[in-house]
């Protein structure tokens, strides 16, 4: 059985479309390189994804005794979470609904073979 560790961040306050831009850059990289890339990105999603990747690395290290240098980001998924519905006043007494989207971010790290 291959060694894998998983970490999930649920209901992150960022739209899935914006989070996927960052997730696509990290997918398939070594864990150390992924964290380094995310550390120097100025996007909001990079900070959130970095925390999830670091959590997955810690899970692999603590729960399965994995060597951090051999880990790579096998899977990273950004799914749509529940939307927060907000109301914005418009002209002539009308209103428009605003959807503040959230994301579920899942990261799976495993041994690079």
From Swiss-Prot:
Taxonomic path: Bacteria, Pseudomonadati, Pseudomonadota, Gammaproteobacteria, Lysobacterales
Job of this protein: This protein binds specifically to 23S rRNA; its binding is stimulated by other ribosomal proteins, e.g. L4, L17, and L20. It is important during the early stages of 50S assembly. It makes multiple contacts with different domains of the 23S rRNA in the assembled 50S subunit and ribosome.
Keyword rRNA-binding in annotation: yes
GO cellular component entries: cytosolic large ribosomal subunit
Membership in a protein family: Belongs to the universal ribosomal protein uL22 family.
Keywords, in A-Z order: Ribonucleoprotein, Ribosomal protein, RNA-binding, rRNA-binding
HAMAP family: Ribosomal_uL22_B
Organism superkingdom: Bacteria
Protein name as annotated: Large ribosomal subunit protein uL22
């Amino acid at each position: 059985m291959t060694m894998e560790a998983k970490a999930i961040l649920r209901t992150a306050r960022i739209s899935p479309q914006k989070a996927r831009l960052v997730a696509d850059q990290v997918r398939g990289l070594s864990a150390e390189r992924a964290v380094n890339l995310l550390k120097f990105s100025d996007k909001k999603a990079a900070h959130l994804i970095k925390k999830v990747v670091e959590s997955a690395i810690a899970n692999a290290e603590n729960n399965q005794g994995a060597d951090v240098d051999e880990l790579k980001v096998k899977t990273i998924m950004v799914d749509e979470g529940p939307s927060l519905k907000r109301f914005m006043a418009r002209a002539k007494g009308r209103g428009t609904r605003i959807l503040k989207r959230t994301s579920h971010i899942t990261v799976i790290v495993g041994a690079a073979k």
